[in-house]
Amino acid sequence: MDKTKILILCIGNSTRSQIAESYFKKFAGDRIQPYSAGLTPSKIHPLTRKVLAEDGIDMVGQYSKSVKEFLGKVHFQYVFTVCDLAHQQCPTIFLNAKMIHWDIEDPSTCGDLEEICIQKFREVRDTIKFHVKEWLTREN
């Protein structure tokens, strides 16, 4: 049986979509192949790696990718947008995929205090983890 292919899309592919990809990999088993990408990708935020490591997830092999890497190459059954801007600007090429939108706050806007930022990143991690588990339970 072919794996269900899903794309998690945000603007930078630095935090929210990376976290979602990690949790889909952790909880979906062999039935789903998750990908993440950004409309204008940047590097993965160091606190993304840190908060996922706290939950036992190693992001080895994950890197920030452009959505252009997948256009015309991968047929996605589902496209998840995890921020409003990505939802508004999502490429129309994904019209054949079922679109799901989770409006998740960008934790990288937390400022310069690491203790405040790490808490924001943990909150976002936990919110995304909840959404992923809930969606997988419904789709099972």
Task: Please describe what each predicted stretch is.
Residues 1-70:
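Conserved active-site segments centered on acidic
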Residues 13, 52, 79-80, 128:
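Conserved small-residue
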Residues 38, 83, 103-105:
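Residues at the C-termini of beta-strands that transition into short coil/loop
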Residues 46, 65, 74, 115, ...:
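Generic alpha-helical secondary structure signal
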Residues 72-95:
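Mid-chain, well-packed structural core segment of small domains
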Residues 87-140:
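Phosphate-binding/catalytic loops
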